A protein has these predicted regions:
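Short acidic/glycine-rich loops and adjacent helix/strand connectors
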Residues: 1-169
Length: 169
């Protein structure tokens, strides 16, 4: 890279390229970016994501300069992937259209909440969760949802009609 950049590279870039690369765990990075700049010296730090390495949710205890992992939930059980499944089912692109679905949510009705709690998300007494994997395709295939999910919600995944897709892009 330094050969390609030649003298056009800033001196700081040359110095950075000679340093050792360090790996950081995905959820620990999220927890650190929330806890360390906060005004708290002690806090419970909860992170939720689609998936990072294998963790999809983590609970850390932040104390001073330390973050200690208390508990984590691993793939395929993921609230982020659950949300992405609904994003795809409603006709939006996964990892791109979630904010659109979130923006539309206040205009809908919670008529499927009981169905979701009964079949899709099982919440344990300790607050942990597990997905009803029989309804999803992301664990073993390339689709977020499967035919059982479609039967549960009485229809195939939606495709945005052209005129709506143009507005939503």
């Amino acid at each position: 890279l330094m050969e390609m950049l030649g003298d056009g590279a800033p001196r700081s870039a040359h110095a950075d390229l000679n340093r050792r690369l360090r790996f950081s765990w995905h959820h620990l990075s999220h927890a650190a970016s929330a806890f360390y700049p906060s005004p708290f010296t002690e806090a419970a730090v909860l992170t939720l994501d689609g998936v990072g390495e294998w963790a999809t949710a983590s609970l850390h205890l932040g104390q001073g300069k330390k973050l200690n992992l208390i508990r984590e939930i691993r793939f395929p059980h993921s609230l982020g992937l659950l949300y992405s499944a609904f994003t795809a089912y409603c006709g939006f692109k996964v990892n791109s259209g979630e904010y659109k679905l979130m923006g539309l949510a206040p205009y809908g009705e919670a008529k499927y909440a009981d169905l979701i709690r009964k079949h899709l998300v099982h919440i344990a007494d300790d607050g942990s969760f597990a997905l009803g994997l029989d309804y999803f395709g992301f664990e073993t295939g390339s689709r977020m949802t499967n035919s059982a999910f479609h039967r549960l919600f009485a229809g195939e995944a939606r495709e945005l009609r052209r005129q709506f897709a143009e507005v939503s892009e």
